[in-house]
UniProtKB/Swiss-Prot annotation:
The lineage of its organism: Bacteria, Pseudomonadati, Pseudomonadota, Gammaproteobacteria, Enterobacterales. InterPro entries: AAA+_ATPase, ABC_transporter-like_ATP-bd, ABC_transporter-like_CS, ABC_transpr_MalK-like, ABC_transpr_MalK/UgpC-like, Mo/tungstate-bd_C_term_dom, NA-bd_OB-fold, P-loop_NTPase. Signal peptide: none annotated. This is Maltose/maltodextrin import ATP-binding protein MalK. Changing residue 355 to Y: Maltose transport is affected but retains ability to interact with MalT. It is found in: Cell inner membrane. Target for inducer exclusion, mediated by the unphosphorylated enzyme III of the phosphotransferase system for glucose and resulting in the inhibition of maltose transport. Acts as a repressor of mal genes. In absence of maltose, the C-terminus of MalK interacts with MalT, then MalT becomes inactive and the mal genes are not activated. In presence of maltose, MalK is tightly associated with the MalFG complex and has no affinity for MalT. It is a peripheral membrane protein. Its EC number is 7.5.2.1.
Length: 371
């Protein structure tokens, strides 16, 4: 195991900057997930750690050693890619041992490591098979095993589940989580799938256009996003946003006017520092935090546009006439409502988020469980 530290790391191709002044501390044994939309720089960041991309400026440390100029093979890292990249003419055992053979490891060492890793990954009964005789999930486990037998101090995974179907992704996600708990290795995992990030990570790094938008535990990012980008990216369905105007402030409270015909005002328990009366801001509320109208004091009303029945839950898309914008309301169980009907939902102030015009969040003061 080893820690990984990035200090003011920047990557540029000519005048195009793809990673901007990245500062990160990844502790020994942590499972850290880099997440963000396509083009945010997450894979580039992973490749700089692996040594497959040069660092334009800044410093990378693995353990106590500065690694900027160290060749990839000498960094003590192992990498699993989106593509399995298995040799089709070699057996599972031969694929897993290929790197060790090239490194000149003794036969008994190779056999011992391959057998140990095969047991961990439930591949022992498949060691003599060729890749064409394996399922997608089994092939991905072989690719992971090939990296594990080298015993890297840092394990890098670049969207390893992207080629799998939905059921296999869930299965492999569970297996990777178990593998980390069993081995305790430092793992850095890249994905665009925020569900993978939330379920796997000890710590999530959200990237936006080459910069670190926020670093934190999964529930911390979900309940206390640093800005509107993180709020909209973490969570599915994504957070609803409403334009509001500040009408008053007090200690640890901000009053805003909702975009409804009755101009209803509501006090939100958020930090009021630097918030000016009259400012235009965005109120955020997650679909699952909206309430049935009969148990709420603050009511939003609109016309049902779409009803999505998922069996275990219902998602209702409601158009708010005054802003010509849809809100998504999610409720567990079945909700029977017709498209075109008028539908009212409740807005709980303690679950609301408030964002300034520049996108930064006013810190929520409501204490959420698990954070």
């Amino acid at each position: 195991m080893a820690s990984v530290q990035l200090q003011n790391v920047t990557k540029a191709w000519g005048e195009v900057v793809v990673s901007k002044d990245i500062n990160l501390d990844i502790h020994e044994g942590e499972f850290v997930v880099f997440v963000g939309p396509s083009g945010c720089g997450k894979s580039t960041l992973l490749r700089m750690i692996a040594g497959l991309e040069t660092i334009t400026s800044g410093d990378l440390f693995i353990g106590e050693k500065r690694m900027n100029d160290t060749p990839p093979a000498e960094r003590g890292v192992g990498m699993v890619f989106q593509s399995y990249a298995l040799y089709p003419h070699l057996s599972v055992a031969e694929n897993m041992s290929f790197g060790l053979k090239l490194a000149g490891a003794k036969k008994e060492v190779i056999n011992q490591r391959v057998n140990q890793v095969a047991e961990v990954l439930q591949l022992a009964h498949l060691l003599d098979r060729k890749p064409k005789a394996l399922s997608g999930g089994q092939r991905q486990r072989v690719a992971i095993g090939r990296t594990l037998v080298a015993e890297p101090s840092v394990f890098l995974l670049d969207e390893p589940l992207s080629n799998l179907d939905a059921a296999l992704r869930v299965q492999m996600r569970i297996e990777i989580s178990r593998l980390h708990k069993r081995l305790g290795r430092t793992m850095i995992y890249v994905t665009h799938d925020q569900v993978e990030a939330m379920t796997l990570a000890d710590k999530i790094v959200v990237l936006d256009a080459g910069r670190v938008a926020q670093v934190g535990k999964p529930l911390e990012l979900y309940h206390y996003p640093a800005d509107r980008f993180v709020a909209g990216f973490i969570g599915s369905p994504k957070m609803n946003f409403l334009p509001v105007k500040v009408t008053a402030t007090a200690i640890d409270q901000v009053q805003v006017e909702l975009p409804m015909p009755n101009r209803q005002q509501v006090w939100l328990p958020v930090e009021s520092r630097d918030v000016q009366v009259g400012a235009n801001m965005s109120l955020g509320i997650r679909p699952e935090h909206l309430l049935p109208s009969d148990i709420a004091d603050v009511i939003l009303e609109g016309e049902v546009q779409v009803v999505e029945q998922l069996g275990n839950e219902t998602q209702i898309h409601i158009q708010i006439p005054s802003i010509r914008q849809n809100l998504v309301y999610r409720q567990n169980d079945v909700v029977l409502v017709e498209e075109g009907a008028t539908f009212a939902i409740g807005l709980p102030p303690e679950r609301c988020h408030l964002f300034r015009e520049d996108g930064t969040a006013c810190r929520r003061l409501h204490k959420e469980p698990g954070v």
